[in-house]
């Protein structure tokens, strides 16, 4: 809701990175029907599902580590849940690429799983698949974002239950390109 309320124009251009099945896409459109969204995901299956869930949105198969290939500029970028799968180096590149894709004054929304980066490890997801998950603290991001010229707008920590009944804390941040 906070991200949606940041835009004064009626039809801001929004890039969603790592859209998955399009749940965030659908939420954004429900809150701001004027959003002009281009949504990307590395998985063809996820893009097909997202298209079914959001027929009015422009979807593209694209790895979040390759967004520099996009030539359009955006008022906002949303990256709901890619950073847990990106190394520090890939996160830095993602932030740099996002900075270049944003118009002046544009906003970047992203989330990560809070924790000590050195404790990053393989985890089993809800589908039973194992993948490597990276943990981050807000301070892990702050220095890189400051260097690029982003200004912190919003930060919150939110607990989410895991499959094994434990909880993990997600960091949700919004920064603005100066």
Q: Could you tell me what each predicted segment is?
A:
Residues 92-104:
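A short glycine-rich, Lys/Arg-flanked "PGG" loop and its adjoining helix->strand segment in the class I
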Residues 123-139:
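Acceptor-substrate binding/catalytic loop of class I
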Residues 78:
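A conserved beta-strand element that flanks and buttresses the S-adenosyl-L-methionine
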Residues 1-11:
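Conserved alpha-helix/loop element of class I SAM-dependent methyltransferases that forms part
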Residues 15-17, 21-66:
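Class I SAM-dependent methyltransferase SAM/SAH-binding core
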Residues 161-178:
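Core SAM-dependent methyltransferase catalytic element
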Residues 150-161:
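Conserved S-adenosyl-L-methionine
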Residues 105-112:
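Conserved beta-strand signature within the Rossmann-like core of class I S-adenosyl-L-methionine
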